[in-house]
Amino acid sequence: MKTYVLMLAAASFFAACNNADNTKKEGEATKINPASPVIKEESVVYTDGKDTLNGYIAYDESINTKRPAILIVPEWWGLTQYPKMRARELAKLGYIAMAVDFYGKGKIAEDPQTAKEYAMPWYQAPKAAQQRLDAAAAFIKGNTVTDTAQIAAIGYCFGGSMVLNAAKLGSNLKGVVSFHGALEGGVVPQKGLTKANILVCNGEADSYVTPDQIAAFKKQLDSVGAPYTFKQYADATHAFSNPEATEKGKKFNMPISYNAAADTASWKDMQDFFKTVLK
């Protein structure tokens, strides 16, 4: 029974322009025209060592300056339509966004067992996961619209754990945002190494994030002086930001569900966070 509970807990954590103004200095504020965005979408191929990866990029072509880049690490289901939708939403906000392919060749898991098989090796090898994320960062920096000094990452469930671990391990990111990600990532932050600003968006009703885990997470970051903000959303379970969570929860008997209020609030918190850390 203990093994089953731990497996279910792990499952829920993983579930659920080319004509840019070259005179603009990196780090200078992006000029955004939200009234008339022209979103360009690109399916891209990049590599991490010998692995071929299939990412997805979106940005607003109506912006004529370089802009910050935000990487998106998906839930354990892989590169589904959900992280691509989030990339388009970030593009409308004036960023260039890239949905990251963690599993290789754009693989998607159709059921929890397959997703677990895909995700667990990365959870168990945080440095390899950091390298995977760094490969995506290196690729997005090569895009002509990217302000290479302003790179951040967000992650959902499994992806939330991955970006938190990358921040703890010292990835060169301005900030990371974890949406309903596991807090026990197996990485202990070190003083002077964890520099990225951190925002954690956690569902208050997430049965797999205990008060003890929250306290331990905060204590770890406080002990090394890491900059972080921890937000909780009332009545929000695991996977609260994904509109498909309720259906998947019923289909696979998982305690996950969509919460529109928490989704909206956490997205606004993310926007406010990036307005501060991406300048």
Over which residues does each language-model region extend?
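C-terminal catalytic histidine-bearing segment of alpha/beta-hydrolase fold enzymes
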Residues: 224-279
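Serine-hydrolase catalytic machinery in alpha/beta-hydrolase-like enzymes
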Residues: 25, 29-37, 43-145, 243-257
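Acidic catalytic loop of the alpha/beta-hydrolase fold
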Residues: 205-209, 238-239
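C-terminal motif of bacterial Sec signal peptides marking the signal peptidase cleavage site
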Residues: 13-16
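Bacterial signal peptide processing site
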Residues: 18-20
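Short beta-strand/loop motif that positions the catalytic acidic residue
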Residues: 200-202
